[in-house]
Amino acid sequence: MKILINKSELNKILKKMNNVIISNNKIKPHHSYFLIEAKEKEINFYANNEYFSVKCNLNKNIDILEQGSLIVKGKIFNDLINGIKEEIITIQEKDQTLLVKTKKTSINLNTINVNEFPRIRFNEKNDLSEFNQFKINYSLLVKGIKKIFHSVSNNREISSKFNGVNFNGSNGKEIFLEASDTYKLSVFEIKQETEPFDFILESNLLSFINSFNPEEDKSIVFYYRKDNKDSFSTEMLISMDNFMISYTSVNEKFPEVNYFFEFEPETKIVVQKNELKDALQRIQTLAQNERTFLCDMQINSSELKIRAIVNNIGNSLEEISCLKFEGYKLNISFNPSSLLDHIESFESNEINFDFQGNSKYFLITSKSEPELKQILVPSR
């Protein structure tokens, strides 16, 4: 293999591909490598991890002198290319090594046998017409993911359905992005008609999707179909620019959540987000950012009082004005870190709280952002 390639184009690709690999993975070392494949008129770059695989196609600003393929350590290759100043780079396989050459630089990198690279789940014979598909505006999708991502569970020991975002298009009229760690629940609604579907995208894959920054307002395309081998998974291809992602979604049913929002509140209040946010941040500082710390919230017709007691450190009392109040007085124990995560997702400065009582979950919304609904379970 021998190619001439534009450094800027190569840098853009490697920067994103580097978000896929796991550097110095001693258990699965092949997850640290890139596969580079030069064909007659294009170059394909491959990378994978235990969750998904990625293919990037480049067919401009290249000159393919010899076809072939090689495998190279991903991070060091990315760092070396990033440190080169010249714009035109020669990449060549020579004596089972990778030669990176410019006018003033010559670097040799060890490679491994191509056959040692795990099978990439990209089949060039795939007929995409056999897949169901839908498109979402990329900016809108990323906006929704960022607003609810804090509710995704980081605990890999619980059910995997809580380690990602559920894409719920089951009614064919809207797409609901749903995330929960069983204590927090966040739902973002995208009004778009589609064929009915329902699948979960794992959090590492979502982080990779979030890393794109398209120059134009583009769409991301999701292709999906039930795996031919079993009914327990959904085969997916996700296309964005010149990248294609291969992913298998395990068909673990996400809980039905829309009915959680349908209750008659006993107490309703409206507060200023920034005032509440500042108070919660001070409490978190006192608690030394301990995410399992609990405090008490008292609600009456004029104010919301939050009392925090931290053993061996101190205590605090925060008073937040209620812009509106309807219903009964309440006293609730809650996690300030979780509440802070929820309210920071809103852009509006007026936040609505609907309470069912002292011990039941409560709803957090904003009239100016009806597409976002969030729930927090009180702590005992």
From Swiss-Prot:
Of the GO CC terms on this record, one is: cytoplasm
Q: Check the record and name the CDD domains matching this protein.
A: beta_clamp (cd00140)
Q: In which compartments does the protein localize?
A: Cytoplasm
Question: Which intervals of the chain form a coiled coil?
Answer: none
Main subcellular location of this protein, as a coarse class: cytoplasm
**SUPFAM superfamilies the UniProt entry points to:** DNA clamp
> What happens when the protein's gene is inactivated?
Probably essential, it was not disrupted in a global transposon mutagenesis study.
Q: Which InterPro entries match?
A: DNA_clamp_sf, DNA_polIII_beta, DNA_polIII_beta_C, DNA_polIII_beta_N
Q: Does the keyword Phosphoprotein apply?
A: no
Any one GO molecular-function label of the UniProt entry? DNA binding
Q: Which UniProt keywords apply?
A: Cytoplasm, DNA replication, DNA-binding, DNA-directed DNA polymerase, Nucleotidyltransferase, Transferase
| Described purpose of this protein according to its UniProt entry | Confers DNA tethering and processivity to DNA polymerases and other proteins. Acts as a clamp, forming a ring around DNA (a reaction catalyzed by the clamp-loading complex) which diffuses in an ATP-independent manner freely and bidirectionally along dsDNA. Initially characterized for its ability to contact the catalytic subunit of DNA polymerase III (Pol III), a complex, multichain enzyme responsible for most of the replicative synthesis in bacteria; Pol III exhibits 3'-5' exonuclease proofreading activity.
In Swiss-Prot or TrEMBL terms, this protein is called Beta sliding clamp
**Protein species of origin:** Mycoplasma genitalium (strain ATCC 33530 / DSM 19775 / NCTC 10195 / G37) (Mycoplasmoides genitalium)
Lineage summary: Bacteria, Bacillati, Mycoplasmatota, Mycoplasmoidales, Mycoplasmoidaceae
